[in-house]
Swiss-Prot record:
It catalyses: 1-(5-phospho-beta-D-ribosyl)-ATP + diphosphate = 5-phospho-alpha-D-ribose 1-diphosphate + ATP. The keyword Lyase does not apply. Pfam families: HisG, HisG_C. Catalyzes the condensation of ATP and 5-phosphoribose 1-diphosphate to form N'-(5'-phosphoribosyl)-ATP (PR-ATP). Has a crucial role in the pathway because the rate of histidine biosynthesis seems to be controlled primarily by regulation of HisG enzymatic activity. Gene3D superfamilies: 3.30.70.120, Periplasmic binding protein-like II. This is ATP phosphoribosyltransferase. Belongs to the ATP phosphoribosyltransferase family. Long subfamily. It is found in: Cytoplasm. Its EC number is 2.4.2.17. Its main location: cytoplasm. The lineage of its organism: Bacteria, Pseudomonadati, Campylobacterota, Epsilonproteobacteria, Campylobacterales. One of its GO terms (molecular function) is ATP binding. Its cofactor is Mg(2+). Coiled coil: none annotated.
Length: 299
């Protein structure tokens, strides 16, 4: 580790959150050189060290105050929190921001040939999972007795290998379940990536840097959700055209050279503009419609 004056951020070394975590930091202006085998990357323009670790280790690094910030899936965070609590500890952290990537769900799944009516169908079954604490909490809340089978990977093969009757695993598209002759029957937890901070107070300098990063994260996320729209519109149809566009702020209206009937409208839309909306705009007389991505945005 470098000197403690540098902000330490833990991210997943490899896996589904790794690439998008690096992209987020880069879009926030954190310049760094990532080497595949290196566990630490040093920012070249900000006093920040990026620690690349297993995702299961990130919550503990935050709970124990080893790192200052972490980007982690809510499922891993809460599983580790419940595990610490089961050992009599009281882990703490600050949730700074839920992020716009890493979406998945933790679901119960059964073999395709099994009939499913309700959760009582899981009574007494042996369930394989990598998230025993989240599963235990859900089953307890629903009054279901079951047998736990904790696996650290390849959970979906457990029924076929006669290790378990059912599974509780992460699902994104469902393709892996189908490939293993399983069907998703109940979502027990919805998850996405989040940015967390250790509970202990940071130095004044570090906190100022965190505040700056949070402002940039908000700007990046807002830019991803927004589009810059430019079009020409008849003056008499402005109200109808604006009603079709969900804007962040009031649009900018500009005169067109040598055209008394039409104006140019520029605005930031907070939603993606679908073809149906563009067609509706055209029906109201709009023309020269341009929809552009926004790289950065600060309100």
């Amino acid at each position: 580790m470098q000197e403690n004056t540098r902000l330490r951020i833990a991210i997943q070394k490899s896996g589904r959150l790794s690439k998008e975590s690096i992209e987020l930091l880069s879009e926030c202006g954190v310049k760094m050189h990532i080497h595949e085998q290196s566990l630490i990357a040093f920012s070249t323009n900000l006093p920040i060290d990026i620690l690349r670790v297993r995702d299961d280790d990130i919550p503990g690094l935050i709970f124990d105050g080893v790192v200052d910030l972490g980007i982690i899936g809510e499922n891993v965070l809460e599983e580790n929190e419940l595990e610490r609590q089961s050992l009599g500890e009281n882990p703490s952290y600050k949730l700074l921001k839920k992020l716009d990537f890493g979406y998945c769900r933790l679901s119960l799944a059964l073999p395709q040939e099994n009939k499913f009516q309700n959760l009582k169908d899981f009574e007494g079954l042996r369930i394989a999972t990598s998230y025993p604490q989240l599963l235990k909490r859900f089953m307890k809340e629903n009054g279901i007795n079951y047998k736990n089978c904790t696996l650290t990977g390849s959970v979906e093969v457990a029924p076929r290998a006669n290790l378990a009757d059912a599974i509780c695993d992460l699902v994104s598209s469902g393709a892996t379940l189908q490939a293993n002759n399983l069907k998703e029957v109940k979502v027990i937890y919805e998850s996405r990536a989040c940015l967390i901070q250790k509970e202990n107070a940071l130095s004044k300098e570090k906190q100022a840097l965190v505040d700056k990063i949070m402002l940039r994260v908000a700007g990046v996320m807002q830019a991803r959700e927004s589009k810059y729209i430019m079009l020409h519109a008849p003056k008499e149809k402005l109200d109808k055209i604006q009603a079709l566009l969900p804007g962040v702020e009031r649009p900018t209206i500009l005169p067109l050279a040598h055209d008394e009937k039409n104006v140019a409208l520029h605005m930031v839309s907070k939603e993606n503009l679908f073809w149906e909306t563009m067609e509706a705009l055209k029906e109201e007389g709009a023309s020269s419609i341009l929809v552009l991505p926004i790289e950065k945005m600060l309100k």
